[in-house]
């Protein structure tokens, strides 16, 4: 285990000179989730949010970045991959806007999972408009426990499925740090390969035979964080609503509503307290790949991504972050959450709990870009993960 961790640290450290100028690529809080792309394996190169950036006015020292990386999670075991990114500014150079980018990423894991991703963010003059784009292909052996908040561990069923995904988004500034926008999402999934007479057939799971989901909807985003990667004060709030119908090209008729709220409290020059709340609702004939899921490397660390799955979700987490010395820091975190078949079916005794701690290694002290090593503990489960960027 120590040898594997050393390899991961080495790969990230090797790319440090290039990573130091990646400030224009903020974390993506609105990119496709587990069911769209890759079940909570890595923090992909993400769409910069329309908030403030700690080094917004600085021009990159280079316009091309390429480096290898290693990741680990319950869902993937260890994975190796590489990323290449091109940075540019459309038209005339403008130091008042962030740099646009195009990223290509590939990942292969010890569970024979393959993920290929193309993503891009383009900033228009004065950042009054932002265009985001993401496309991906994935072949993903995974696990499923059925629907509900009280599924037994023994219900676990292995399956595999191919997915194609595309998601353009367009945002327009309406007031200071407030943006409104439009998102379109298309996903094609092949038939699920799974054991006969398993949970997929017993529960008549929607989407197990594959199909197309195609939907459109609005985005409302507000961001006052002072740093894209690891803020020490400010807040973030985003609401997305997506409408899937036959006239949009979807084989399934359903709607999605998601809410993401975050707040960061400055305690001292070396410590920060952060909290997050997530909410999700789906209505209609929702395929299982678009349902709400509990677990993963970001929320409810310690549980497998999708350990509990249903139409509605609420989850909360808190994290204390402390810088120690040089590039080293520590964190302690706790989370709780549950899923339900409808908003009225949430129960006080239905919450699941996780907790844990981790180490941080600053790849870029200026931009607060960290390598994250976490160990989460949950009921009948625990997880050791190595990721790039904070959980939130």
Residue ranges and their predicted role:
Residues 23-53, 62-65, 130, 134-267, ...:
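Transmembrane beta-strand segments of outer-membrane beta-barrel domains in Gram-negative
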Residues 216-221, 225-326, 330-333:
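C-terminal outer-membrane beta-barrel translocator/porin domains of Gram-negative envelope proteins
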Residues 1-30:
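Bacterial Sec-dependent N-terminal signal peptides
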Residues 56-66, 70-212, 307-309, 369-370, ...:
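Gram-negative/organellar outer-membrane beta-barrel architecture
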Residues 21-133, 207-230, 323-329, 339-343, ...:
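Outer-membrane beta-barrel initiation region
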Residues 217-218, 356-366, 381-392:
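Outer-membrane beta-barrel "beta-signal"
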Residues 200-204, 289-300, 338, 345-357:
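Solvent-exposed, glycine/polar-rich loop segments of beta-barrel outer-membrane systems
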Residues 305-309, 343-349, 376:
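Short, contiguous acidic/charged loop-to-helix segments that flank catalytic cores in large enzymes
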């Amino acid at each position: 285990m120590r040898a594997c961790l050393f390899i991961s640290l080495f790969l990230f450290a090797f790319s440090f000179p290039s990573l130091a100028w990646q400030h224009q690529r903020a974390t993506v809080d609105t990119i496709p989730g587990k069911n769209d792309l890759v079940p909570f394996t890595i923090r992909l190169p993400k769409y910069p949010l329309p908030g403030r950036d700690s080094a917004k006015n600085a021009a990159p020292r280079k316009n091309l970045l390429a480096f290898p990386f290693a990741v680990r999670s319950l869902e993937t075991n260890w994975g190796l991959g590489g990323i290449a990114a091109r940075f540019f500014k459309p038209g005339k150079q403008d130091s008042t806007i962030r740099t646009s980018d195009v990223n290509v990423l590939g990942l292969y894991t010890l569970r024979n999972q393959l993920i290929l991703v193309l993503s891009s963010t383009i900033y228009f003059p004065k950042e009054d408009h932002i265009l985001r784009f993401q496309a991906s292909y994935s072949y993903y052996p995974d696990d499923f426990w059925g629907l509900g908040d009280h599924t037994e561990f023994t219900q676990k069923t292995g399956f595999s499925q191919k997915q194609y995904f595309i998601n353009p988004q367009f945002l327009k500034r309406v007031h200071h740090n407030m943006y409104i926008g439009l998102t379109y999402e298309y996903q094609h999934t092949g038939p699920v390969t799974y054991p006969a007479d398993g949970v997929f057939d017993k529960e008549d799971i929607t989407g197990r035979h594959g199909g197309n989901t195609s939907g459109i909807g609005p985005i409302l985003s507000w961001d006052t964080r002072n740093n894209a990667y690891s803020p020490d004060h400010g807040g973030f709030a985003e609401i997305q609503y997506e409408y899937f119908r036959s006239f949009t090209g979807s084989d399934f008729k359903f709607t999605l509503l998601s809410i993401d709220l975050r707040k960061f409290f400055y305690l001292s020059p070396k410590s920060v307290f952060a909290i997050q709340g997530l909410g999700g609702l789906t209505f209609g004939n929702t395929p299982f790949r678009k349902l709400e899921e509990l677990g993963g490397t970001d929320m409810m660390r310690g549980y497998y991504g999708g350990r509990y799955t249903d139409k509605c979700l609420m989850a909360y987490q808190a994290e204390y972050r402390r810088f120690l010395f040089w590039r080293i820091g520590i964190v302690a975190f706790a989370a709780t959450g549950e899923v339900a078949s409808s908003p009225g079916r949430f129960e006080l005794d239905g919450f699941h709990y996780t907790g844990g701690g981790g180490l941080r290694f600053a790849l870029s002290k200026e931009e607060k870009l960290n390598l994250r090593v976490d160990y989460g503990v949950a009921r009948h489960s625990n997880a050791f993960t190595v990721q790039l960027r904070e959980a939130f």
